């Protein structure tokens, strides 16, 4: 099973927020997921990014691939330093 860490869109029309989830790469964007590890709200000022770092590191070390957007969010939150990459 190819696993990705990606964003799942939630919220109202024109007021989105996103949950950071671990999901099978073949499932739809808002479909089934394995685990929820955090959320991202781009609408608020300042932008809110909260996630469980331990779960994120565990999934990445087990082979989960973060999408480009999630990778940028992790870098912004300082997770890159904890992974040693």
UniProtKB/Swiss-Prot annotation:
The keyword Ribosomal protein applies. GO terms for cellular component: cytoplasm; small ribosomal subunit. Gene3D superfamilies: 3.30.1320.10. One of its GO terms (molecular function) is structural constituent of ribosome. HAMAP family: Ribosomal_bS16. PANTHER family: 30S RIBOSOMAL PROTEIN S16, SMALL RIBOSOMAL SUBUNIT PROTEIN BS16M. Keywords: Ribonucleoprotein, Ribosomal protein. One of its GO terms (biological process) is translation. Belongs to the bacterial ribosomal protein bS16 family. It comes from the Bacteria. This is Small ribosomal subunit protein bS16.
């Amino acid at each position: 099973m190819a696993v990705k860490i990606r964003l799942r869109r939630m919220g109202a029309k024109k007021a989105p927020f996103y949950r950071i989830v671990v999901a099978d790469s073949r499932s739809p964007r808002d479909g089934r997921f394995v685990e929820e590890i955090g959320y991202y709200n781009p609408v608020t000022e300042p932008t809110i990014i909260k996630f469980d770092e331990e779960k994120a590191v565990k999934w990445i070390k087990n082979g989960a691939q973060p999408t480009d957007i999630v990778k940028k969010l992790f870098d912004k939150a300082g997770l890159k330093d904890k992974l040693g990459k």
